[in-house]
From Swiss-Prot:
Belongs to the dynactin subunit 2 family. It comes from Dictyostelium discoideum (Social amoeba). This is Dynactin subunit 2. Subunit of dynactin, a multiprotein complex associated with dynein. Keywords: Coiled coil, Cytoplasm, Cytoskeleton, Dynein, Membrane, Microtubule. It is found in: Cytoplasm, Cytoskeleton; Membrane. One of its GO terms (biological process) is mitotic spindle organization. Residues 1-51, 201-228 are annotated as: Disordered. The gene is dynB.
Length: 430
């Protein structure tokens, strides 16, 4: 379409500038809309961790780690292997009554205490492995320091059991006694209620017999008993607490642990920290695994390399003996030269005394030269100050002259204005 026909086509439409070219708006492609929708959905999702990862730091973190797949079964069988127990009492998580992460359920003090013991124990063992390998958890944070801090935490948890008020709540052994005391009190209360019930039943039977006796006269009497009607049953509620049975199981397991610790000390375990038997068995298995044929071949290759190095050391010893003979000759030559220097050494004290006498002269000359240099510096400073002062005086003279001229001009202007004002006043008065 030609440009001449264009204004006629849009002449009657509102809000249209006919002087500009036609422009057509097209919708964006659907891909950008979908991308925006995806981005908005990803931004709303709070479970995604958007922290940037640094490859160097992650490499340092997993550099000394090894993958252990001993307990994994890659066969096609459905049968699940029974996982052996590793560690002591605190490692078996099923022993403790640890609640799931649910807001409706609240942990008891005993459950919280046991959970903290378990978490601190497991975390300390992880840090002990890192400390044995000599690694670092993070930058400038060693595993040994963390193990010491975790040991302090365990001591603080153990000190809680020493408090007499907290022992019935936190100690499993004391808790069994606490529950037994509660049961004894409840049983005594039940017996007292049964006795009171029997007494009430007897009293009610006697009152009924008295009311049923016939009267000798023909007159009828209405007898009303003022005693209150008592119920003929006793309600006794029994509450079963699962913590008692669990505490008894824990007490049995603790007794077994103590017996095992005594056996370990009797067999010659001299370490202060009690190491569980499963851990020692795993260490023995690791030592026995060194007797494999593949590892023995590796050891043979290492022995061959060591023998080659020993032979190279023998060759180096022979070369070192030759070097020692040459060194002995050099030492003899040095000894002869030192004997010659002994004669010169006898004259050294006289030379030293002469140097001491010359030292005072040199020091006086140095001090005099320093004074002269200071005087020269002061003279230069004074000359520079005089030059700067003269330049400033010249500038002051120039500025005074310019200021006088401006003042004179201002005075003349003021006088002229005053004269004009006086003339105007005279004219107005006339």
């Amino acid at each position: 379409m030609s440009e001449g026909n264009q204004p006629k086509r849009v002449l009657g439409l509102p809000d249209v500038d006919p002087s500009q070219q036609d422009t057509f708006e097209t919708p964006d492609p659907p891909e950008s809309i979908s991308n925006l929708a995806d981005e908005s959905s990803e931004l709303v999702n709070e479970s995604i961790d958007r922290s940037s990862l640094k490859p160097a730091k992650s490499h340092l973190k997993f550099a000394n780690r090894k993958f252990n797949n001993d307990n994994e079964d890659f066969s096609d069988s459905i049968y699940k292997k029974s996982v052996p127990r590793t560690g002591g009492l605190l490692k078996n998580q099923t022993v403790f009554d640890i609640l799931p992460s649910d807001e409706s359920k609240v942990e008891t003090p005993l459950q919280k205490f046991q959970r903290l013991q378990y978490e601190v124990m497991s975390f300390r063992e992880e840090m002990q492995v890192i400390a044995d390998n000599g690694g670092e958890v993070e930058k400038d944070i060693k595993g040994v320091d963390l193990t010491h801090q975790l040991a302090d935490l365990q001591n603080q948890l153990s000190h809680l059991l020493e408090n007499e008020k907290l022992q019935p709540i936190l100690d499993e052994n004391k808790q069994v006694i606490h529950y037994s005391q509660i049961q004894n009190n409840s049983s005594k209360k039940l017996i007292s209620e049964i006795e009171s019930f029997t007494q009430q039943s007897l009293s009610s039977s006697t009152t009924e017999q008295n009311t049923q006796q016939p009267s000798n006269n023909n007159t009828t009497t209405n007898i009303t008993s003022s005693s209150s009607i008592t119920p003929n049953h006793v309600t006794y509620e029994l509450f079963y607490t699962g913590e008692q049975s669990k505490s008894q199981q824990l007490q049995r397991i603790q007794d077994l642990e103590k017996r095992l610790a005594k056996l370990e000390t009797a067999t010659g375990n001299k370490t202060t920290d009690s190491v569980p038997i499963t851990q020692s068995i795993l260490e023995i298995k690791e030592k026995l695994s060194l007797l494999d044929t593949t590892k023995i071949d590796v050891l043979q290759q290492k022995m061959k390399t060591v023998s080659k190095e020993m032979e190279s050391l023998k060759i180096q010893d022979e070369t070192s003996t030759k070097a020692l003979t040459t060194n002995e000759k050099k030492i003899n030559d040095i000894f002869e030269t030192m004997n010659k220097w002994d004669i010169v050494g006898q004259q050294v004290p006289a030379i030293i005394n002469r140097l001491y006498t010359l030292r005072s002269l040199h020091e006086e000359g140095i001090s005099f030269s320093n004074h002269v240099s200071n005087l020269e510096k002061q003279q230069n400073d004074i000359t520079s100050l005089l030059i700067s002062n003269s330049s400033l005086m010249n500038k002051m003279d120039d500025s005074f002259k310019s200021n006088l001229l401006t003042i004179k001009s201002n005075i003349q202007q003021l006088e002229s204005r005053i004269e004009t004002l006086q003339n105007r006043q005279q004219q107005q008065q006339q």
